[in-house]
Amino acid sequence: MIFFSMILKKKIKKIFFNKYIKIHLIRAIFGIVAMYCGYKALSIISLSLASTIGFTKVFFTSLLATIILKESVNYKNILLIVFGFLGIYLIALPSAAPQLEGLVFGLTSALFVSGGIISVSYLTKKDNTVNILMFHSVISSFLVFLIFYKGISFDISDNFFYLILMTLTALSGQYFNTESYRNEKANIIIVVSYSRIIFSTVLGFLILDEKIDLVSLLGIMIIIFTTFFVKKYSVNNN
């Protein structure tokens, strides 16, 4: 029993005195801000617009990887990123003030998602997967409770079904996304991943009665086109 306690104590000390704890903390903060801004964006703009804006994480990740991780980026990617932000401008062009606020939240979410991707990319080269997952879960849960504890309601009886449905769909999405990369080529996954914009548009139209004007639709198509090729060139370079 004493021997077991000593081993457990040593393990706990090793975990919580992790020398990459600052990066784990930064990653958790990125995740919290991304999640909060993502939900705020969904409460203001349409489902299809929010899904499309989410793909701008490809632009931000390419830029951050060049600046922080010193990864090389070719001129084609730079031109595509600039062209992609033209699509965002077109989406914002006809927007009223509230919708513009939603686009800002969506872009902020995409930026912090990119920060999370960069931090995970760094951590995977320095720390093991179990530590990365554990620290993210523990730190995120603690910070969310600390920041939002006054607004947290544990009375979930009215929304229990929707919360369970949201949890199941999120877990299913993560599972099938992981399996798709295991069983198929990345180039094909890139193409198929854009189907979420189609699903978001259709579901938003059928269930939420959402509508998209022609200028916004053009902006969406530009973002789809540019992020597709940024991803494609990145995969080919790797």
Predicted features along the sequence, with ranges:
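Helix-helix packing/entry segments at the starts of transmembrane helices
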Residues: 50-56, 123-138, 174-206
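Loop-to-transmembrane-helix transition segments
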Residues: 12-37, 100-109, 154-172
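Cytoplasmic-side transmembrane-helix entry/capping segments in multi-pass membrane proteins
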Residues: 18-29, 73-85, 102-107, 126-138, ...
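Transmembrane alpha-helices of multi-pass small-molecule transport proteins
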Residues: 1-33, 112-116, 135-150, 225
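Transmembrane alpha-helical segments that form core, pore/gating elements
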Residues: 95-155
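Hydrophobic/small/kink-forming positions within alpha-helical transmembrane segments
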Residues: 28-36, 58-63, 88, 114, ...
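C-terminal transmembrane-helix exit sites in multi-pass transporters
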Residues: 57-79, 198-217
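Hydrophobic transmembrane alpha-helices of multi-pass small-molecule transport proteins
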Residues: 76-92, 215-234
